[in-house]
């Protein structure tokens, strides 16, 4: 989980880049911060002949990190924008920026194809194309959706070199963006308390360029004037809370600056976003193993204060009410966590080959399939894959996703 603190040139280290989906809800950002094993000198020389054996040129890593830091900022501030393709099929600006970055890395001479990842992508795409050509050809499917998924998965196959010092620079850039996001949470509340309402970025984006199927303006309580903070540029409060939640996990695991951790914690509670809180809670067992005792003691001492603050501003009451949503159909909690699992289970039980091969790209309704679907719904990626590509497609997609994000021993990011 950790890396040494030395600033000397290191052997390659691995951190993942997880692309965001623009045809379904983006997968939540991982809270893991894995480090890779060193690349053998022979393999390093083969990949980068100009590098010293066993090390990466710091100048190369610095240039790569510069591009990735700028890219990270641009992806965050443009996530509400998308390029319309056909119907509800869109390509997020984030994806366009990612491929632009790939082009820059090609020109820099640092982009490489990771063989194992590439073969796993090829296996899924080949399966999908054969099934759509033979099995789903008559029932119809969305070529645009299939093409979009191919673009998304292909991003997993590309890697670039990195060392520890510049890896830290990328993480620090993420943390600084999270500071701004946390400040925007308080700005959102401040303008509402002042009677100015909450700034709505969608008022300034042409409809056809808005990234659809996200609840950007989300009421805190139905029929009440208050809106949950959206951080202005974030897709919705869940994305904002996940971003801040991951910053809190990174801060505790990596940098351990208590003032930053406190800022993220208060902002996370003030966002009223449940998914970011769940992300932190899911990471807690791993953090307890990593953190020195004095930090654990600080967390234990701060917990009662945070609970009091949470109770005073209504967070605990809100979370209690949200907890009941899991059993209430059409509620946010049900749609986000329960409905995808139920829909996936029903899809696997379809007659004939439907459970194994799926019903075709783009076929999942924008809502509960048993109730005709509803407009404005973004599915969890796993449910979309199971429904449209079947059990076999899911068994090809899941290892690829887990390997690309969580595996160790890759000498690149």
Located regions from the model:
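Long extracytoplasmic/lumenal interhelical loops at the membrane interface
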Residues: 80-87, 317-389
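Membrane-interface helix-loop-helix junctions at transmembrane boundaries of multi-pass membrane enzymes
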Residues: 56-62, 106-119, 251-262, 293-295, ...
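N-terminal hydrophobic segments of proteins, predominantly signal-anchor/transmembrane helices
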Residues: 66-81, 98-157
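Alpha-helical transmembrane segments of multi-pass inner-membrane proteins
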Residues: 172-196, 218-272, 278-289
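A membrane-periplasm/extracellular boundary helix in multi-pass inner-membrane enzymes
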Residues: 183-192, 288-328, 347-350
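Transmembrane alpha-helical segments and their membrane-water interfaces
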Residues: 103-109, 136-193, 397-401
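Loop-to-helix entry and N-terminal half of a specific, functionally important transmembrane alpha helix
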Residues: 67-77, 301-305, 404-413
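Hydrophobic transmembrane alpha-helices and their immediate junctions
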Residues: 283-287, 294-298, 388-413
